Amino acid sequence: MAATAPEPAFWDALGWQPSQAQRDQLEELQGLLQSWNERVNLTRLVNGDDFWIGQVFDSLWPLAGELQSANEPQHWIDVGTGGGFPGLAIAIALPQAQVTLLDSVGRKTAAVEAMASSLGLADRVGVRTERIETTGRDRHFRGSFDRAVARAVAAAPVVAEYLVPLLKTDGEALLYRGQWADSDAVPFNRALRLLAARLVEVQHRQLPSDRGTRHLLRVKPNGPCPRSYPRAVGTPSRDPLGS
């Protein structure tokens, strides 16, 4: 199926008016994703509203503040990027950002790296094939990012252990969630205390076309993350903090 363009109301709902070059890049990204998805099982959200709402809108709706200061150079990392979201959408929307896309599955990172190159983003988008627990202990990455994001990766305490060690002390982690209840905050806040971090905001948004409610958790460090985190590969998911 050919790439499509959303109606103007889509951008109004998102609260962001991309340049024509950015619109062209997002449309090109849809075509690239469709093509690569025939070879590598990246995602089912590639056509029509599945792509524009389920991928682009869902990636960018939490970034209202960041989109208003899009020319500010920042270092971002997308953990568990899968088919490249939200990382590739963020790289297009924030033209001064340096974005690292991380996934442990080599077939996915190869596809995402090729898409970034085709989009002309290779100078700002780096791709890394590695388990996040390893990256979080690498001195070249630990404590290096202004923003760390993850969408649909694991339970919130697990994701926090993945993201917080990557942050600068004035950085912020963005945890994309589907549903979120007050009861979820109890184990999550216990985990954050161990990581020397705090929950600063819970945002929520109804997606267009009745595509469900999404939540975003914004987390900030209280100081450097204790060096014991992240724990060994597999331990965060097997034995979540705060449980």
Swiss-Prot record:
Gene3D superfamilies: Vaccinia Virus protein VP39. S-adenosyl-L-methionine binds at residues 80, 85, 132-133, 151. Keywords: Cytoplasm, Methyltransferase, rRNA processing, S-adenosyl-L-methionine, Transferase. Residues 211-243 are annotated as: Disordered. It holds the Pfam family GidB. Its main location: cytoplasm. It is found in: Cytoplasm. Disulfide bonds: none annotated. It comes from the Bacteria. One of its GO terms (molecular function) is rRNA (guanine-N7-)-methyltransferase activity. Its EC number is 2.1.1.-. The keyword NADP does not apply. Specifically methylates the N7 position of a guanine in 16S rRNA. Belongs to the methyltransferase superfamily. RNA methyltransferase RsmG family. This is Ribosomal RNA small subunit methyltransferase G. It comes from Synechococcus sp. (strain CC9605). The lineage of its organism: Bacteria, Bacillati, Cyanobacteriota, Cyanophyceae, Synechococcales.
